[in-house]
């Protein structure tokens, strides 16, 4: 098999092309934007919108998810789903997270959904990226990588997490349904 071939071939460029095993073989545009700050929040809200309305939301200029303000790595967003407005925040860096938590505890702000990524700009600027000291933490380079992910999303055949066949199979065969007791127990964090 392929494992045996890999062990015998030192030049990996000579390995035959093949598809990834499930569940990693199929990707969605929503999954790709997970790599940028705000991407997980946006992908989750796309699916929430579909769950409530039965329709996929517009993406891009016509999206119901609106950026209200952006200051550095902090974005404040809002989405209206059938008359229910959700106030959201997306930020990157643990220092930003600490400041937001303190402001929320003091009652200075309220958010229904907060996404925090530890690395500035998100995973696109994280430890899994090639180490290039001239690149790290440069906002323009992070913005360029963000735009690459967004372009991939725009050109993806499947743009919504809930349309990923592997995710659908996982719910059908193991988690029962979104928000089921089993899914809630395994996937949701109440406190940490």
Model region roles, listed by residue range:
Residues 1-8:
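Short, small-residue-biased leader/transition segments that mark boundaries at the very start
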Residues 131-150:
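Catalytic phosphate/nucleotide-handling subdomain of diverse soluble enzymes
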């Amino acid at each position: 098999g392929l494992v045996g071939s890999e062990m015998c071939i030192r030049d990996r460029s000579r390995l035959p092309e093949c598809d990834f095993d499930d569940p990693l073989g199929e990707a969605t545009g929503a999954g790709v934007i997970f790599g940028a700050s705000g991407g997980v929040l946006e992908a989750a809200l796309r699916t929430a919108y579909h769950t409530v309305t039965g329709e996929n939301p517009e993406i891009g200029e016509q999206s119901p998810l609106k950026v209200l303000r952006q200051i550095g790595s902090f974005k404040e967003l809002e989405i209206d789903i059938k008359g229910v407005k959700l106030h959201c925040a997306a930020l990157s860096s643990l220092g930003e997270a600490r400041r937001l938590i303190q402001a929320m505890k003091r009652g200075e702000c309220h958010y229904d959904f907060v996404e925090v990524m530890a690395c500035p700009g998100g995973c696109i600027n994280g430890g899994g990226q090639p180490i290039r000291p001239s690149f790290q933490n440069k906002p323009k380079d992070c913005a360029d990588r963000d735009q690459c992910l967004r372009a991939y999303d725009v050109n993806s055949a499947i743009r919504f997490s809930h349309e990923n066949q592997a995710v659908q199979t996982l719910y059908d065969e193991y988690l029962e349904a979104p928000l089921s007791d089993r899914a809630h127990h395994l996937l949701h964090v109440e406190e940490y």
